[in-house]
Every structure is written in C-alpha cells, then in structure tokens.
C-alpha cells in the first residue's frame, strides 16, 4: 500500500497544480448510506464483538472542486465511513481525487450526472490486532467509488441524489483481503463560488481537439507486489513473502468521441504467485512448503475489451478479458480491470489500476507508466 499512497500523492499534486488556473470553484457536502457486503461474510453476518449483523453503513463527504468547461468538475475530497462497529473495523477516513460531469440534460434545471472517486482510506483496524475483522489486514486501503445522480441546478446551488457504489481493499498486498463493498444512495449539496483568477483549462497547451473517428494507441507497463495463496488437502494457506506481478498492455483505441474511446488490448502478464498450489509440498498434517513454478506457468497473454472515459487530466478505463495463452488453473477464467490514468504531458501518463478475477477475486494492483500514440 506504500506504492499506492505514493501514487495518490502524485495525483493530488497534479490536481493541486491545475487548481490555481481556475476561476469557478465548488464546495459540497454529502451523505451516503447503504448495504455493506464482502466475500468474507462472517464479520458482517454477526461474528463480531457486537454479536449482531453489520447490515448498514454510512459515510459523510466534504469536497472542494474547480469547475471545468462543458458542465464538468474535479477536485479533492474527504470521506468518513462508519459500519457502526468501531471496535472491530475502525472508522476510516478516505482522501481522494474525484471528477464528475453531466451525462444528459433533462430540462433547464435537471440533469443526469456521474461522479467517480479514487483514493486511499486510513484508520482501518488490522486483522492481526482485531481478529473479528476478517475483511481487512492493513490500516491503509484503496478507496474506489462511483455514482449516477439526478441533479437539480440553480445559478450557484446544486442538489444531487442517486445510486452509489464503493469498494475498499488493499490490492492483495496483504491477507486477508476480502475487501468491503457498499451499495446504496447518496445525497449531495454543492455551492458554486466565483474565483478571482481568469479561467484557463488545465494542460491547455496539450489538450487535443475533437478527434472523433480517429485511432490512437496506449502502451502501459506496470508492476506491483502481492501475496500468494496455496491450496493443499482442501486447506488454504498463505505463502510466505510477497510475489511480483508485472506486465505490458498494448491497447489500440477508436475514438467514438473526444471524451469516449473503445478498443482491444493485448495483455502480456507475469505473475510470480501463479499456480503455487500445483507445486505444494506437505504431508498428512498439512503444507510444509512449495517449489517455485516454472516460468511457463507464471506468464500469460490475454485479450481484453476496453472502454475509456477521457476528461482533462484524467481518464478512467474499464476492461474485461481472458487469457488465450497460459498454463495452469490460476491463469484461467475472466479478468477485469479498472484503472485511472493521470496525464502528465500530452503523451505520458501515470497508470493506477486494479485487476480482479471472475468479477469477485482481488488479483493485484496495476501501478505503472504509459505512453499514448495519437493519429495512428
């Protein structure tokens, strides 16, 4: 999680530098409430110090943003989460960057909007100190949130309500890492404040014109550390130490709109922890060790479909794919990717992402750099 925190710091610096160029600002406060769920169900089902299910979660948010042209905004926010079980889980505080924009205008004062948040959450109680907490093993965890909202606008006031989903986890850097999800509703009120500086666009020296119908290509290299698991005689063991995950994604895009791209990606991946179970050593009493798998069981080549929302400074990408060249059960099945690209220059970007398997199992972080080739 140290690498993720460093990456978040760089993203916050990029946002802070661009804030100085904007003339309109936005202050907001909101509440979120919903149903918490996790693949590891014991804590939420009532095996905790309270002796009752944890079936309600709530959060309060405060945000500062600068307003971009064309009804969009981005900035920095804080969120405080409660599962109403501070003893076992803690009351974590999240620091995040966010971006929102209009999807459709319904009338002069009503619209459908979206907003995403990405950051880090601090203050979780760790599993080794609080054994009832079977969902989190680190005090700092990633925070990802997305919302679709019905918004009412006046000259300087905005009120929004809509469905909301949140995910917390440590990127499989420690175990347990079941993570926590929350689905529910949010209510936000925002006020627009006029600034004193002239309005300019962030990175306006490199912003592209509308390239609808054009082609581009992103090449991303990434690496991260993760924990490995071993199944032996129907028991699950956590392998000692950490393992490397790395790769290169070669991703051509077709630009449907200057703010939306679709494409395919050739995903070349290396996972040092893959297929450890096939090389486990033990006896009737349990696991005693393992042999490192051969390289051919640790590398894979896959194809994935990608969709990307492109905004000033940031791009948010979603992908779903399947390995086509691989060996071993751990590299089979579908994988999913969600990633945030922070554009440093016209072509260079920071890549901060997360890969899942089969829509539910955390796999590893995708921390790296990428280069965009335009007009291919």
Residue map of PLM features:
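Short glycine/proline- and aromatic-enriched beta-strand/turn motifs that initiate or cap beta-hairpins
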Residues: 23-66, 200-251, 372-376
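Outer-membrane beta-barrel "beta-signal"
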Residues: 36, 181-202, 362-376
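Transmembrane beta-strands of outer-membrane beta-barrel pores
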Residues: 33-37, 80-84, 118-126, 154, ...
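Transmembrane beta-strands of outer-membrane beta-barrel proteins
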Residues: 25-29, 72-76, 112-118, 159-161, ...
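Bacterial Sec-dependent N-terminal signal peptides
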Residues: 1-29, 110, 152, 157, ...
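Residues on the lipid-exposed face of transmembrane beta-strands in outer-membrane beta-barrel proteins
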Residues: 60-66, 95-103, 116-120, 144-152, ...
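Residues that define the transmembrane beta-barrel architecture of outer-membrane proteins
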Residues: 25, 54-60, 89-95, 110, ...
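Repeated loop/turn-to-beta-strand initiation elements of outer-membrane beta-barrel proteins
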Residues: 25-27, 37, 69, 107, ...
């Amino acid at each position: 999680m140290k690498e993720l925190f460093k990456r978040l710091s760089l993203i916050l610096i990029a946002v802070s530098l661009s804030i100085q160029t904007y003339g309109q600002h936005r202050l907001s406060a909101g509440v979120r409430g919903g149903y918490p769920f996790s693949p590891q169900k014991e804590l939420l089902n009532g095996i905790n110090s309270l002796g009752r299910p944890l079936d309600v979660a709530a959060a309060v948010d405060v945000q500062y943003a600068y307003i971009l042209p064309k009804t969009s905004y981005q900035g920095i926010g804080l969120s405080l989460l409660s599962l109403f079980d501070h003893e076992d889980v803690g009351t974590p505080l999240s620091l995040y960057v966010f971006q929102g924009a209009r999807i459709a205008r319904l009338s002069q004062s009503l619209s459908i909007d979206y907003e995403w948040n990405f950051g880090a959450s601090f203050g979780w109680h760790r599993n080794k100190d609080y054994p009832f907490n079977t969902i989190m093993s680190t005090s700092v965890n990633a925070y990802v949130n997305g919302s679709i909202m019905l918004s009412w606008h006046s000259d300087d006031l905005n009120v929004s309500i809509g469905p909301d989903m949140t995910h917390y986890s440590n990127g499989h850097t420690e175990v347990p890492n079941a993570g926590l999800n929350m689905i529910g509703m949010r209510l936000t009120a925002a006020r627009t404040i006029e600034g004193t500086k002239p309005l300019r666009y962030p990175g306006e020296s490199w912003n592209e014109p509308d390239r609808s119908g054009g082609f581009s290509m992103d090449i991303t290299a990434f690496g991260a550390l993760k924990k490995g698991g071993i199944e032996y005689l129907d028991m699950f063991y956590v392998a000692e130490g950490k393992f490397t995950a790395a790769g290169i994604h070669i991703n051509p895009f077709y630009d449907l709109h200057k703010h939306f791209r679709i494409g395919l990606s050739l995903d070349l991946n290396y996972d040092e922890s893959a297929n450890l179970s096939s090389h486990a050593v033990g006896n009737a009493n349990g696991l005693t060790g393992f042999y490192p798998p051969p390289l051919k069981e640790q590398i894979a080549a896959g194809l994935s479909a990608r969709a990307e929302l492109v905004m000033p400074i940031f791009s948010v990408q979603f992908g779903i794919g399947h390995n086509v060249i691989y060996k071993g059960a751990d590299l089979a099945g579908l994988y999913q990717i969600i990633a945030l690209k922070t554009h440093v220059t016209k072509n260079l970007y920071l890549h901060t992402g997360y890969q899942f398997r089969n829509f539910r199992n955390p796999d590893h972080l995708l921390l790296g750099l990428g280069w965009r080739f335009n007009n291919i």
